[in-house]
Amino acid sequence: MKKRLAVLLVIVLTITFSFSVTTRIKDIAFFRGARDNQLFGIGLVVGLNGTGDSGNVNSPLLLEMMKKFGVQVSENDLKSKNTALVMVLADIPPFAKEGMRIDCVVASIADAKSLAGGYLLQTPLYGADGKVYAVAQGSVIIGGEDVKLSSNLQKRYRVVGYLPEGAIVERDIPSDMLDGDSVTILLRQPDITTAARVARAINEKFEMDLAKAIDPSAIKLTVPNAFQDDLITFLSLVEEIEVQPDVPARIVVNERTGTVLFGGDVKLSDFVISYGNFTISVTGGKIGDKDATISNLVSALKAAGATPQDIIAILQVIYESGYITGELIIM
């Protein structure tokens, strides 16, 4: 006999979610000009105990690439299994100054088996403009040795390493937030309603029209005369203003892992669906003048023994039929 589920508003959930959470502007946005920049370079890891590159893949092309990036090696240097060609990557933060240290990551380019115990030789790191902004060097840390993983995952993680504070900044990163007498606030998650709320909150805080949302991702902010010579203090006050971001009605499902994530006010229209051993009847109730929600539906399905794959398949059918008010994203 099929199981019948009635998802009504009379269902009382032991856990409730409130989406009217306020947060600081600095947690959802940043100032234009104050962003990370990506650096990259090609280097050589030495000191590997026979787990480096075989030498068969170290073609003249790779040698030329290393010379282009300022690393001088001979073909014989690359034939030993104690060395490995690596790509070196780093994110340099805004306002980084000469002499500061930043973290970097190394990843094998060729057929090395493991970078564990290796040492990265001095490697220049370039920006998108072709200039050297940092130099990396140091011991490679693999980590995760005690974590139980499949053999395939273990092999993958052993050829990617980490150098905490392994690169020294050699050139200041130019960062200019001020454009005339204004700065621009950029939302990390563009949204029309959130942009309008940020502008309104700033204007209410300073009791003057300083901010204006110019599109869903940007708010133009005029620096008042009182702070023309103290921009940092003004921006710090702006960062601490609390706003209520607008959370879109959205469901995200990962078919491979069976994960279901839903946020915002995702609601359901009335429907009846039959799926396998389940018959689901969803009815919007009258209590509190609210509709049936995804939270109610997923909780009821889990209580009835539905697997994550069952839940995902049911959500897909409901969404494609137009009974979900929100966006469904399948990963």
From Swiss-Prot:
Localization per Swiss-Prot or TrEMBL: Periplasm; Bacterial flagellum basal body
Keyword Translocase assigned: no
Sorted UniProt keywords: Bacterial flagellum, Periplasm, Signal
First-listed, main subcellular location of the protein, grouped into a coarse class: periplasm
InterPro entries: Flag_FlgI
Signal peptide (UniProt feature, chain positions): 1-25
PANTHER family: FLAGELLAR P-RING PERIPLASMIC PROTEIN FLGI, FLAGELLAR P-RING PROTEIN
Functional summary from the UniProt entry: Assembles around the rod to form the L-ring and probably protects the motor/basal body from shearing forces during rotation.
Family: Belongs to the FlgI family.
Subunit structure of this chain's protein: The basal body constitutes a major portion of the flagellar organelle and consists of four rings (L,P,S, and M) mounted on a central rod.
Protein's UniProt name: Flagellar P-ring protein
